[in-house]
Amino acid sequence: MKVVGIHGILHDYLTAPQIENEWLLALQGGLEVAGNPRIERNEFTCVGYGDFFRPSGTRSGYTPSLSYTDIEGEWEEELLLKWWHEAATLSAKNRSGEDELGENGTIQDPEFQGRGRIPEIAQRALKQLSKSKYFKAWGSEKVLIFALKQVRRYLYDKELKDKILQRVTEKVTQETRVIIGHSLGSVVAYEALCANPQWNVHTLVTLGSPLGIQNLIFDALTPTPENGQGVWPNVEQWFNIADKGDIVALEKELAPHFGSVTDLLVYNGWESHDVKRYLTAKETGCAVATGIFE
């Protein structure tokens, strides 16, 4: 396959073929908008790994019953606070009502709320994030907490990480020229490329990536960054594409952390982290085309 896509969080009940159908149409559109030919179905595949997070013995669509009391340890608290702070920053920018598709203007800043014990902080954070247009699209607060835990599990559960990376290895071939990673999938894509320098992949495209979040994600990567610099994956080009309102992609620019990354901003409206909106962007079409056609 010329192009391999790797999805992000909250795909517990979707398999690779389902995700491929969704991604392919959007990617074909992005390529056309950028003035390039479409790729065909037999040139594209997706890596599915959401089933590893699916609770066993439960009905489809079930998310574990989670609340603010289930936020565990400093890592989960800190990422939750970073999401809250970013949502509040975007809220403050939009209080003039200039952008109807921008963030809710009533989200209070964490500093306004004060600090306290983890359960208290988590409860306040979830209350404010429930106002966010982005997180509201996820549904209930238990879904947000479940997503938070998926990120931590991937980073720190070696057995789980190895299984997910094996799924990537099974999809990448000598013909693979481009890997696209969205959200947590960008972390998976990066680590898979670093672990397999023999691959013939030309271009990495990261969409809505959390790779640059210091201390929590960047510093937990494999291989470990040194002196504030991440290891360059074995690719010729790396395009990092983010919406300025994407709360998950807290660090919009990855070049300061990894070197010769081409950082690009796009506008996805209020669905700032939505993968289809990223894939249909002209910038994404151009980035993918450089790996396929040049």
What do these predicted ranges mean?
Residues 1-64, 105-180, 184-294:
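Lipid deacylating catalytic domains
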Residues 41-105:
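N-terminal accessory alpha/beta regions
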